[in-house]
Design a protein with these regions (language model features):
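Conserved hydrophobic beta-strands of the Rossmann-like cofactor-binding core
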Residues: 1-3
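Conserved NAD(P)H cofactor-binding loop of Rossmann-fold oxidoreductase domains
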Residues: 5-13
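Catalytic loop of short-chain dehydrogenase/reductase
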Residues: 8-9, 22-24, 48, 53-80, ...
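Substrate-binding pocket helix/loop in short-chain dehydrogenase/reductase
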Residues: 13-26
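Hydrophobic positions on the long internal alpha-helix
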Residues: 36-43, 47, 84-85
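Short, small/polar-rich loop/turn modules that mediate ligand/substrate recognition or access, typified
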Residues: 96
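C-terminal helical subdomain
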Residues: 99-102, 107, 115-134
């Protein structure tokens, strides 16, 4: 079993229409998408012979399927990962693949969004998460 739980928010201060820093984008996708795919590939090379006992869990988010204004990096990265794992599940029927979205969890991420996001609606949503104790 392998759990893919890596995740960073990316730049919350840039609007989607202003995402022009290719190096920043590359670094984000390297961590959140490309490295996950590379690690998963190595995992399968080693353990795929076990057949029915191989389980892959990708920790995803509602943001993978529902756009959230102010979170273009995060939403697009989660969407890319989720679709990668869906394709993998189609191709490798004997491998159990789970895209699991736990919902909002109270972590440092919530505080980071509240303090760093420039989108006020996004801040309000995350203030709501925090006040609900999620």
């Amino acid at each position: 079993i392998i759990f893919h739980n890596v995740g960073s928010l990316g730049n919350l201060a840039v609007e989607t229409s202003r995402m022009e820093n290719v190096e920043e984008l590359r670094q984000y996708y390297d961590l959140n998408v490309f490295n996950v795919i590379a690690l998963n590939t190595q995992f399968l090379k080693i353990f795929e012979e076990v057949e029915e006992r191989v389980v892959i869990v990708n920790i995803t988010s509602l943001c993978a399927i529902k756009p959230m204004s102010g979170m273009a990096y995060y939403c697009s990265g989660k969407a890319a990962r989720e679709l990668y794992f869906k394709v993998l599940a189609e191709e490798k029927k004997h491998v159990r693949v789970l895209n699991y979205s736990p919902g909002p969890v109270e972590t440092a991420m919530i505080d980071y969004v509240i303090s760093e996001a420039v989108n006020e609606n996004l801040k309000d949503v995350f203030h709501s998460f925090k006040s609900q104790g999620t």
